[in-house]
């Protein structure tokens, strides 16, 4: 009998917590709510450079129900994408202790009539500890940070795109 009462109390407590969380507006990050006219998109990247952001952005767009294909109504053009690395701090022997990584992306969104509706420059930055004795580990960490920055930038682009008001015909 006591065991049944404990389970019932736990169920009531769990239900109350869920209600409180939903009442305050909390929700898990899920797919973006995209207006129907925005669900078709042409994605263009600079021809001369191999974009590291493009495959990440394409996967994210498609995962959120946006068909990425040539000739679609809206156009998202990555104008430029620049990665950089600089020394952030130096140690006592003038050795590099930290590097600062950054990725800067400039993009534009055009409506089906070719009118610009959104143009932004986004920046993602990370700093990491560098150890010259562990070069391979530092290189792997740098590569992982660039991947995280690409994901961050792709999410920002998606949020900005999802908040657009569709053009009225």
Describe each model-derived feature in a short phrase:
Residues 61-65, 109-113, 132, 156-165:
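Sec/Tat-exported extracytoplasmic proteins
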């Amino acid at each position: 009998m006591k065991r049944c009462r404990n389970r019932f109390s736990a169920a009531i407590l769990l239900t109350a917590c869920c209600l409180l969380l939903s009442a305050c507006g909390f929700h898990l990050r899920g797919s973006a709510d995209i207006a129907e006219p925005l669900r078709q998109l042409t994605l263009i990247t600079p021809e001369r450079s191999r974009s590291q952001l493009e495959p990440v952005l394409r996967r994210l767009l498609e995962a959120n129900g946006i068909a990425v294909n040539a000739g679609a109504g809206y156009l998202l053009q990555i104008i430029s994408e620049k990665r950089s690395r600089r020394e952030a701090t130096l140690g006592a022997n003038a050795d590099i202790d930290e590097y600062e990584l950054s990725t800067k992306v400039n993009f534009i969104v055009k409506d089906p009539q070719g009118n610009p509706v959104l143009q932004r420059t986004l920046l993602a930055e990370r700093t990491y500890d560098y150890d010259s004795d562990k070069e391979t580990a530092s290189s792997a960490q740098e590569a992982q940070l660039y991947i995280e920055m690409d994901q961050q930038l792709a999410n920002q682009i998606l949020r900005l795109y999802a908040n657009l008001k569709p053009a009225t015909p």
